Amino acid sequence: MSNVLNMNNYPIPRLDREVKLRENLLRFCRLEPGQVWFDRQNGHRVGCLDASSVPDVITLCRNDRASLAIHDLPYNFIAFEQKRIDEFISWCRKVVNNSSEVLADSSSLYLWIGADQKNGFAPLPELMLMMRETGFVSRSFITLRNQRGYGTQRNWMSVRQELLYYIKGRPKFNPQYTDIPKAVKGYYKNVNGRLTENSARGRGETIRAGNVWIDIQQVFYRLEENVNGCYAQKPLKAIERIIDASSSAGDIVLDFFSHSGTTLLAAEMKGRRCLTMDIDPIFCEITIRRLEHFRQTGQMGWQNSNPFAVELGANGNK
């Protein structure tokens, strides 16, 4: 696996659970709530802001309008019972409405969301119903298959991540192709009086990506792109696929829940401008450091080291 490297072994635990570590890391964060970091090189912005706040969204986006938004909604609040489902959906409505105000008339919106099989698959169905009341039109329900899952011997293993795709207006869509070769042949069809086999009718030598993604590696500690401490990191390849499909070079991409900074990094690699925010100063700092780290080293993450290894040292408690 080409993106598996041997790096320094300085892991840190999940940052949402370690109160003392968080207090220590806040000393190294350059942003405080309400502040925005501006990238002088390519025009990216990172804000320590609240996605449900209209003034905060305006602070980040100003008069810019994006062609694409990719939000990894913090559905773990439901799993940890920090919010009731109805409160969470009401909050999501604010986030979606705020996104709509800073998206172009023709644009795309992607929402990562969970489905708790122990709780009626909440909050997925509730979010779907809420989205019917917005100005967005549903386009696809995508499943990203994890290589590892969880469950018991009395149920099917849970190995999926859910991604909802919506649009407003008539945005561009560029079909994407996987690295999977076409293996199944023999489906013939008469096209303009000529009998053709299915592989001859296709536009690529490999399989076109559908709404079930089985070809993307789940992030784990041996991958270069891994960012220790970030418990909800999405694969860089998944975000790159979305950006390639639903935007063009030079477009603006939004992400209101930056977390590990994957959307910002993908935008940098794909020649887009990213306007992103996180309410947590630590994840804002990680996002900025990940971009800087990539520009300095060409590496997409820290594998089993961490963004604060210099400050914390090998034992993680300087």
Q: Residue locations for each model-derived region?
A:
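Core catalytic lobe of class I
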Residues: 1-17, 23-277, 281-284
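Conserved SAM/SAH-binding loop
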Residues: 51-54, 305-313
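Short, flexible loop/turn segments with low-complexity composition
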Residues: 177-181, 298-309
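Conserved SAM-binding loop
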Residues: 287-288
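Catalytic-site neighborhood detector that most strongly recognizes the C-terminal catalytic loop/helix
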Residues: 292-293
